[in-house]
């Protein structure tokens, strides 16, 4: 199974670029930008990557993001991920970025998006990896902040494929951002949203009915609502599931408890992704291998989820066929 996972071409649809910041690069960028870290070494940073829930992870995640300042930093961050993606036979990726994490520290929006998109262009030219960029609003910030960020995004509309929603779900339902998403769709952006990770299955309904999303990021709480499971299967609304993340953040106690196989067997369009791989102990192939071993998935299951990742992507039909043939 390991060899098959490594050999098959794959698409990744749920990867936060800030979450691919490995400790080694964190220290390099901290030195470049004269930033003091609370960790004295790379090893100490790695040991600190222990979380009890989403919020405790976010506290460390944002500390790491503080080393990102200039265009070069965002280029290096993105390029590092793309090099790993190439080694894992990822031929298409749709990357999240969180501009508010940086603009709130005084980092220019232009530096963020230019650094990332220049790396993505180089990834296409030098590595053969196609990509789209998804801007995520931080749901624990205000709607006004999201609107301000959207105005910045509109200026770079040709570089941003979709608008998303992430960060702490608790007390931050999708409905809070309905008007912002209405505006985003009117401007031509596609929409996705994190829902049903820590939040209830109702958050998934809200993302579908109010935010009009093309796919649900995480979505594993759908299992609590049989009608929702039936609807997701009927409409083939994709779920971008992140197994190692779910265990690391205590959504499930262990991979053996994960409901991915149940959802897959009920006909849902399930995909596997790495989420924040630097923090959760594995990139895409490691997620595939770990969940395959834990749930005793078959090669047919594996093939189905890889097919789903291309089907669920924002590529057009001919692009999907071309990449998968390769």
UniProtKB/Swiss-Prot annotation:
Enzyme Commission number(s): 3.5.4.2
Pfam families reported for this sequence: A_deaminase
GO terms of biological process kind: adenine catabolic process; hypoxanthine salvage; nucleotide metabolic process
Keywords: Hydrolase, Metal-binding, Nucleotide metabolism, Zinc
One Gene Ontology term of the molecular function aspect: adenine deaminase activity
UniProt function note: Catalyzes the hydrolytic deamination of adenine to hypoxanthine. Plays an important role in the purine salvage pathway and in nitrogen catabolism.
The family this protein is said to belong to: Belongs to the metallo-dependent hydrolases superfamily. Adenosine and AMP deaminases family. Adenine deaminase type 2 subfamily.
Protein name: Adenine deaminase
